[in-house]
From Swiss-Prot:
Residues 78-97 are annotated as: Disordered. It comes from the Eukaryota. It holds the Pfam family DUF2406. To yeast YMR295c. This is Uncharacterized protein YGR273C. It comes from Saccharomyces cerevisiae (strain ATCC 204508 / S288c) (Baker's yeast).
Length: 174
């Protein structure tokens, strides 16, 4: 009996050897558009190149501000405080700013009410939780205060027992 090789198998092997394209070797305009700088980055980078020609990376220094003389100016947030390390997604806020402080900053920029400045928590707490807030326990990974939880569970069980007893007494009294 003769064994014949399938022509499908030969074609599949031939196809895989022909189609070994890598995405890094493709020269598609879409891929170039993904990797090119945004217009605001290009403008910032060209300004930086004029003032400081040794600057190479626009994304690294794209949000640094220089005055007319070429001196470095520190960025300021909505409240006028200096920003030492800007956030990557929003360079007008500090990287370690609390999210509620960001919202308060928006409220302040709209209303100019000084009350928002008094409610800021980043300078007082940093990125630590508020006092009295349940902290994650390192040993059990539970984010609850056990003594408070036990008290709440006991109270809820007592309430359920009272409801159950009152229902039973109503049924028996009828």
């Amino acid at each position: 009996m003769q064994h014949f090789e399938s022509s499908d198998k030969i074609e599949k092997d031939d196809d895989t050897s022909r189609i070994k394209l890598r995405s890094s070797s493709l020269a598609a305009p879409i891929l170039e558009a993904v990797q090119e700088a945004q217009p605001f980055e290009e403008a910032t980078f060209s300004n930086l190149q004029k003032i400081h020609p040794l600057t190479e990376n626009s994304t690294c220094n794209g949000y640094v501000i220089y005055d007319k003389d070429g001196n470095l100016k520190s960025m300021k947030d909505t409240f006028g405080r200096n920003i030492k390390t800007p956030d990557i997604s929003n360079p007008t806020r500090a990287r370690n700013e609390r999210p509620l402080d960001t919202i308060r900053g928006f409220e302040y920029s709209i209303t100019k009410d000084p009350r928002w400045l008094q409610e800021l928590e980043t300078s007082k707490l940093g990125f630590k939780p508020r006092p009295g807030f349940a902290v994650i326990n390192q040993d059990s990974q539970a984010s609850i205060n056990l003594s408070q939880l036990e008290e709440k569970v006991m109270e809820s069980q007592k309430k359920k027992e009272k409801r159950h007893i009152s229902r039973l007494s109503r049924l028996l009294c009828r």
